[in-house]
């Protein structure tokens, strides 16, 4: 699914596509011209094809109509788009991004960030303490910052954005949080708050402990919650 948002955060255009870029439906109340399809592609109305900088792509066939200009360097098939377009992209019409752009270092950064964030999230679910969502957001990203690795921090920030997009989508079906569907403006505000907390944790000074950095997100009157977090090693 793709969407365009205006300066106020309102969805001005949205479209749903299958794995190969075929448009399934479109919501365009303002009659906007929006030609973008899969990453790097622009819809050509006259031909019905997608322009990919170096060649044209046919979404009905799921392949390019001309051979790869870089030959076999782009893969064994001279006409193929990434064999798994869910995980691979080809923004220039040359070779899949997982071959051309993503290096082993980036994959390791992503995995390290994912491990820290997911471990902290699992602790949050296990402890099941009310009113601690933002605290755990802060702690997860603060833990990433302590690696002092810009690449891992960048990956973590991207994962944080992906989670908020996922949460927004879940809310559309009443499956987010307490299963009470929020309005668009309420959900945008919720997303903004979470992202701000993520940044607060991620920018923790090297001389500051994560428990000190994030303790303000815990109500000081909630003594049992504080005790549980201390026992779990999250607070001093």
Swiss-Prot record:
InterPro entries: RHS (IPR001826), Rhs_assc_core (IPR022385), T6SS_VgrG/RHS (IPR050708). Disulfide bonds: none annotated. It holds the Pfam family RHS. Transmembrane segments: none annotated. PANTHER family: PROTEIN RHSA-RELATED, PTHR32305. Belongs to the RHS family. This is Putative uncharacterized protein YlbH. It comes from Escherichia coli (strain K12). The lineage of its organism: Bacteria, Pseudomonadati, Pseudomonadota, Gammaproteobacteria, Enterobacterales.
């Amino acid at each position: 699914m793709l969407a365009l948002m205006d300066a106020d955060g309102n969805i001005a255009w949205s479209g749903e596509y299958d794995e190969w870029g075929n448009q399934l439906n479109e919501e365009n109340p303002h009659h906007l011209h929006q030609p973008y399809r899969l990453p790097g592609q622009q819809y050509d109305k006259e031909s019905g094809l997608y322009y990919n900088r170096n060649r044209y792509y046919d979404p009905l066939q799921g392949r390019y109509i001309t051979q790869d200009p870089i030959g076999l360097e782009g893969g064994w098939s001279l006409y193929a788009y990434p064999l798994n377009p869910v995980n691979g992209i080809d923004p220039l019409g040359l070779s899949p991004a997982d071959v051309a752009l993503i290096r082993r270092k980036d994959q390791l950064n992503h995995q390290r960030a994912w491990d820290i964030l997911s471990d902290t999230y699992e602790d949050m679910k296990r402890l099941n303490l009310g009113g601690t969502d933002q605290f755990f957001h802060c702690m997860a990203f603060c833990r990433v910052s302590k690696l002092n690795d810009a690449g891992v921090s960048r990956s973590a920030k991207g994962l944080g954005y992906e989670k908020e997009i996922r949460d927004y989508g879940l809310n559309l079906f009443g499956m987010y949080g307490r299963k009470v569907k929020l309005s668009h403006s309420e959900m945008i505000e919720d997303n903004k708050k979470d992202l701000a907390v993520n940044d607060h944790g991620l920018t923790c000074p090297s001389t500051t402990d994560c428990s000190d950095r994030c303790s303000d997100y815990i109500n000081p009157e909630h003594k049992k919650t504080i005790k549980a977090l201390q026992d779990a090693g999250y607070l001093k």
